A protein has these predicted regions:
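Non-catalytic, topology-defining segments of multipass membrane proteins
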Residues: 1-83, 118-249, 322-389
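Residue-level signature of the transmembrane alpha-helical core
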Residues: 53, 81-82, 113, 117, ...
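Extended hydrophobic-aromatic, low-complexity segments
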Residues: 275-279, 320, 327
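Long helical/loop segments within the catalytic core of UDP-sugar-dependent glycosyltransferases
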Residues: 86, 126, 297-307
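Aspartate-rich (DDxxD/NDxxD/DxxxD) Mg2+/diphosphate-binding motifs
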Residues: 93-113, 139-152
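Transmembrane alpha-helical segments that form the membrane-embedded catalytic/substrate-channel core
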Residues: 85-95, 124-128, 252-281
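Histidine-centered catalytic micro-motifs
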Residues: 91-100, 128-140, 267-275, 305-319
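Flexible internal linker/loop segments at domain or repeat junctions
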Residues: 270-298
Length: 389
């Protein structure tokens, strides 16, 4: 397929100003040497993936069910609900690993199993995260072509607050996307284009437009959409017949919203977001990203499946999550204390969020906030993307 044509706007913000110590560390940092020190850690072990995911899934289902007999307004019911949120969040986080290893044929069973067991019932099928590759592309990271990035440190603080508030509406997204727009899109090509451009990517940049499915992907995407629609129909039938109470549906909505808010908080802490919507090198991406190596048991709750060591992930996106801690320990041992990699560390979630708030306020005080984006120019769409039927 021909590459999507992109019309890059003229720069609208000054170049990124890194602190002097960061600049020196970036100049001295060698990605190749860091990679060589991690030899032998790049092979994913599927047994670990299956065991972790299935255990998390069992905990999620059991704790979700327990809320009913315990009572949602009791201490026990509230505790069970919190456990279900954390377990579901961990299950959901595996979509990130799936996005990185989807090219490996050995990963297909896990990808399909995760999708059937968790992705489709949660109305988050795997194709909705195919856009993640752009977040690691040197040309796209931090630009308007990156669905998962906004230069929040250079934007109004309200932009960050919105990312914590809007997820409360996400329980409505799945039913709307798969229950309303999807059936219409099967018969109206224009709606189908709108569906894939605007409603088929997990994103924080609401102006981001996703790609259309490739010819070889169309059937697979539609089958996943149909499965989500059938699942919704089955749930509706169970509720209508009284087999499942309406209260469980509201519980699912509360669960989904809580997971979405928790993930948004994690996202706000995952990067420094100091980009100016221009391309960044791999080292610059690493410096714009944050590691949270301290308080591992707590960090694993709000940044599960390796997401707490996010700077490591952007430096070495081919690492499987179960080797992150060993890889981090090797790098810390091999690199000097003033290494660029060591400068990506943050004490914790609150510290990272606090830094983002301070940087946004500093830009506001200095009058250097990014202006609101102008309307995006129309993108040329390759012929094979126009043929979406």
């Amino acid at each position: 397929m021909a590459e999507r044509q992109r019309q890059r706007p003229e720069p609208t913000a000054p170049a990124i100003v890194w602190e002097p110590e960061v600049q020196r560390a970036m100049r001295d940092f060698s990605v190749r040497e860091a990679h060589q020190s991690l030899n032998g850690l790049f092979k994913p072990r599927l047994a670990v993936y299956w065991a972790d995911f299935l255990c998390s899934y069992v905990v999620a289902v059991a704790s979700f069910w327990a809320v009913g007999p315990l009572g949602g307004l009791t201490a026990g019911g509230a505790a069970a609900f919190v456990v279900s949120v954390l377990a579901v969040f961990r299950c959901f986080a595996f979509i990130h690993e799936i996005a990185h290893f989807r090219a490996k044929r050995s990963f297909n069973r896990f990808r399909n199993g995760w999708n059937i067991i968790f992705g489709i019932p949660m109305l988050v099928p795997v194709f909705m995260y195919d856009c993640h590759g752009e977040h690691h592309n040197r040309r796209f990271y931090g630009t308007g072509e990156d669905a998962e990035y906004l230069p929040l440190a250079r934007m109004s603080l309200w932009s960050s607050v919105q990312l914590l508030v809007l997820p409360l509406m996400l329980p409505l997204f799945g039913p709307y996307r798969f229950g309303v727009v999807t059936p219409v899109s099967w018969f109206v090509p224009r709606v189908r284009t709108y569906l894939y451009r605007n409603l088929s990517s997990l994103k924080i940049d609401l102006e981001y437009e996703g790609r259309l499915p490739k010819p070889e992907e169309k059937l697979n995407w539609r089958l996943q959409e149909a499965a989500c629609l059938l699942w919704m129909g089955a749930v509706a039938a169970l509720v209508a017949t009284g087999t499942v109470s309406l209260g469980r549906v509201w519980q699912w909505c509360a669960l989904f919203a809580a997971v979405a808010v928790l993930n948004s908080a994690r996202l706000l802490a995952a990067h420094r977001y100091v980009g100016n919507e221009e391309e960044m090198s791999v080292v610059e991406q690493m410096m714009d990203t944050v590691n949270h190596p301290r308080n591992r048991p707590l960090a694993e709750l709000w940044a599960p499946v390796g997401l707490r060591l996010h700077a490591l992930h952007h430096l070495m996106p081919g690492l499987p999550y179960h080797n992150y801690q060993l890889a981090h320990d090797r790098l810390v041992s091999a690199l000097p204390p003033d290494s660029a990699y060591r400068l990506t560390e943050s004490p914790g979630l609150c510290a990272s969020l606090g830094r983002l708030v301070r940087e946004s306020r500093a830009h506001q005080k200095a009058g250097t906030l990014l202006p609101a984006r102008a309307a995006k120019p129309a993108r040329a769409v390759p012929s094979d993307e126009r043929a979406v039927r």
